[in-house]
């Protein structure tokens, strides 16, 4: 038999297999991030991977709609794989309106996007995130941004910056320039400002008819500044917006130092459901974008008919793992028990069960390898102790335990290990 052709042995394009060392690294990140969310009073939630397509497309925007894994099931229903967790959570809240608010939920879940795979980016990937639902307070904004920073630090990000904006500020700027009708083109351009040269970004804005001088004004205004400087900029654009932003900055500064945060009007986020404060996190020497979020005060009304303010963030887990250098975690076997003959098997199994009850990982040799092969095998898989049991050891009432790290060997009474 020739087996499967090579392309069928590999995962579907954009997907990945998780080998044990990689999966243990993922689980470590899951434990770290979940612990931070729990400490802030958030509780874990999960939803089905499959959603009605209409639910996913409700406020996604055409670019995201094009990335949805879409299909019809055997009953003819139009379905899709979730592309984030915010939309499914909004749907869950739509039939749980009696929950006490604010609701604080978090997740660590698989999501799917049919975009072009590239290094570090897959079509199936994990997101960690939080949603704070039922509060319009700037304290809620500050809490979620603080939680994002705490999550990055807990994950091992020693170098990071969180860039913050408010979509209403961009709209006020466009209004002052008489350019609100060009909003979509401007948002598209600003979303690419950190990735493309100045002329290309301005070209995207002017391609829809926006005058060049207005495009240049928008580009130059959308520059990085401190949060304190941003308060004054926003006050000049709109007094009420500036005062609201000043409160947000005050509450954030009360919780964390502000040097990790910058105001950047080019941060608009690609999803169409954001309505206010938006932010993105960049990590490491290459400032890898690992996640972001913002306020989406209109989204829940689309599903429930009730206006409920909300905000949250999502982190691309694999991107964060790459940024902090967490690619694999070795988990060596604690004990490998080798027996020289069948008479020792029942003693080996009894010892293995005893050690497992104590929390150790234990393997008993299946009788297909000689001692030389076993030595090679246990070193390759990573093992701390090799236990040897044979007729001579049983006659003496002992087992031999070889420490494969320190390269020492001792005899230990079998009764002491079993008691």
UniProtKB/Swiss-Prot annotation:
Q: Which family does it belong to?
A: Belongs to the class-II aminoacyl-tRNA synthetase family.
Keyword Transmembrane helix in record: no
Origin organism is Pyrobaculum arsenaticum (strain DSM 13514 / JCM 11321 / PZ6)
Broadest EC class assigned to this enzyme: ligase
Q: Which InterPro entries match?
A: aa-tRNA-synth_II (IPR006195), aa-tRNA-synth_II/BPL/LPL (IPR045864), Anticodon-bd (IPR004154), Anticodon-bd_dom_sf (IPR036621), His-tRNA-ligase (IPR015807), HisRS-like_core (IPR041715), HisRS/HisZ (IPR004516), HisZ (IPR004517)
Check the record and name the Gene3D superfamilies matching this protein.
Anticodon-binding domain (3.40.50.800), Bira Bifunctional Protein, Domain 2 (3.30.930.10)
Pfam families (alphabetical): HGTP_anticodon, tRNA-synt_His
Instruction: List, alphabetically, the NCBIfam families matched.
Output: hisS (TIGR00442)
List the molecular function annotations (GO) for this entry: ATP binding; histidine-tRNA ligase activity
UniProt entry keywords in alphabetical sequence:
Aminoacyl-tRNA synthetase, ATP-binding, Cytoplasm, Ligase, Nucleotide-binding, Protein biosynthesis
What is this protein called in UniProt?
A: Histidine--tRNA ligase
Q: Which GO terms describe its cellular component?
A: cytoplasm
The gene designation is: hisS
Reaction(s) this enzyme catalyzes, per UniProt: tRNA(His) + L-histidine + ATP = L-histidyl-tRNA(His) + AMP + diphosphate + H(+)
């Amino acid at each position: 038999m020739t087996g499967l052709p090579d392309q069928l042995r590999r995962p579907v394009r954009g997907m990945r297999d998780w080998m044990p060392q990689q999966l243990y690294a993922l689980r470590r990140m899951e434990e770290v991030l979940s612990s931070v969310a729990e400490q802030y009073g958030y509780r874990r939630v999960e939803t089905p991977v499959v959603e009605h397509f209409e639910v996913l497309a409700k406020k996604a925007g055409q670019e995201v709609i094009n990335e949805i894994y879409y299909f019809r099931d055997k009953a003819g229903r139009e379905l899709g794989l979730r592309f984030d967790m915010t939309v499914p959570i909004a749907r869950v809240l739509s039939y749980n309106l009696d929950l006490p608010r604010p609701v604080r939920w978090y997740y660590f879940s698989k999501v799917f996007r049919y975009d072009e795979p590239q290094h570090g980016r897959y079509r199936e990937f994990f997101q960690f995130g939080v949603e704070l639902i039922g509060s319009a307070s700037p304290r809620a904004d500050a809490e979620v941004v603080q939680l994002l920073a705490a999550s990055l630090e807990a994950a091992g990000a020693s170098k990071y910056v969180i860039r913050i904006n408010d979509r209403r500020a961009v709209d006020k700027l466009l209004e002052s320039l008489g350019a609100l009708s060009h909003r979509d083109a401007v948002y598209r351009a600003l979303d690419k400002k950190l990735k493309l040269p100045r002329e290309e970004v301005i070209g995207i804005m002017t391609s829809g008819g926006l005058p060049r001088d207005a495009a240049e004004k928008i580009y130059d205004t959308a520059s990085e500044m401190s949060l304190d400087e941003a308060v004054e900029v926003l006050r000049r654009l709109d007094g009420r917006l500036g005062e609201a932003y000043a409160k947000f900055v005050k509450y954030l500064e009360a919780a964390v130092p502000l040097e990790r945060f910058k105001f950047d009007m080019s941060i608009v986020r690609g999803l169409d459901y954001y309505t206010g404060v938006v932010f993105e996190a960049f990590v490491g020497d290459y400032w890898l974008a690992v996640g972001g979020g913002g306020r989406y005060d209109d989204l829940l009304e689309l599903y429930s008919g009730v206006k409920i303010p909300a905000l949250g963030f999502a982190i691309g887990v694999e991107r964060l793992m790459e940024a902090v250098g967490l690619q694999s975690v070795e988990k060596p076997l604690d004990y490998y028990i080798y027996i020289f003959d069948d008479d020792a098997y029942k003693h080996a199994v009894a010892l293995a069960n005893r050690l497992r009850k104590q929390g150790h990982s234990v393997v008993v040799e299946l009788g297909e390898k000689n001692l030389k092969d076993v030595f090679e095998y246990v070193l390759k898989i990573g093992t701390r102790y090799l236990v040897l049991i044979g007729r001579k050891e049983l006659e003496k009432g002992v087992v031999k335990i070889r420490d494969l790290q320190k390269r020492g060997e001792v005899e230990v009474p079998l009764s002491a290990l079993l008691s």
